[in-house]
Amino acid sequence: MKKILIIGKKSFLGSNLKIFLSKFYKVDKFSFEEVLKKKSFFFKNFSHVINTSIHKNYVNSKYNAKFDLDKIFLSKFEKVDFYYIFLNSRKIYFPKNNIKENSKISPIDNYGKNKFLTEKFLKKKLKNKLISLRISNVLGTRIYKNLRNNHKLFFDNFLEYKRNNKEISFNDDFKDFITIKQFSNIISKIIKLEVTGIYNVSLGKKIYVSEIVKWLDQNLYKKIKFTDSSKDSFTLSNKKLLRKIKINITKNQVKSFCKSLIK
């Protein structure tokens, strides 16, 4: 039976993945600080390691290796025997429609630049043990509330707007959203099939901001002025990954998930 190590005890992705993956695999979850204290032999029993922890300076500042937690962790090992799932970002690309894995790399901010630099290091270090996932926007709720969050979610921003209860305006860009359920299922299939390589993880379809707000809360939707825009619009092609794992993810699944979040 495959055994999974998740690094990032209380992160959004880590805590949700722990619940989902535990249905199919043996899963352990530790904080980044805890795994750094472990000796190399501790990791021999794990088939896959997923790092979901991140330093706030890695998100907001220019690249500095002392804030690159993936590099710090993997530098513990002379030889890596487990598969390493690197949670990359769609921000390594310039926003446009139908971005493929071989599209030009053109990071839009420091976070995107830092992720690409880390990916380059991991490709050299891990070779065929690397799974680098260039992820679109993941929708879902945090299991652990009121904690230090180094990376704001779309749903965090939505709840903030909802609490303010004011009339606001949004650019009605289209985005590529994927739910935490869809994302977790994709990770499970990648583990089961021992997929390796670089892949976009996305719905692969346009969802306009106005659509998703309406699915989440029709009352809030009525208070927002939406302006046509394509400045920050993007979708990621997911065909390469779906050919490997053969699952069906749909826009209707995203719609149903959104409606279940606000009750």
Residues of each region from the PLM?
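NAD(P)H-binding glycine-rich loop region in Rossmannoid oxidoreductase-like domains
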Residues: 35-75, 90-92, 96
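N-terminal Rossmann NAD(P)H-binding glycine-rich loop of SDR-like oxidoreductase domains
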Residues: 2-23
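Active-site helix of classical SDR
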Residues: 110, 114
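Alpha-helical substrate-binding/gating segment
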Residues: 155-168, 173-200
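Conserved C-terminal active-site "lid" loop/helix of NAD(P)H-dependent oxidoreductases
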Residues: 180, 208-214, 225-263
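Mid/C-terminal beta-alpha module of Rossmann-like enzyme folds, strongest
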Residues: 184-232
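Conserved Rossmann-fold NAD(P)-dependent oxidoreductase catalytic core, especially the SDR/UDP-sugar
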Residues: 72-108, 131
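NAD(P)-dependent short-chain dehydrogenase/reductase
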Residues: 120-174
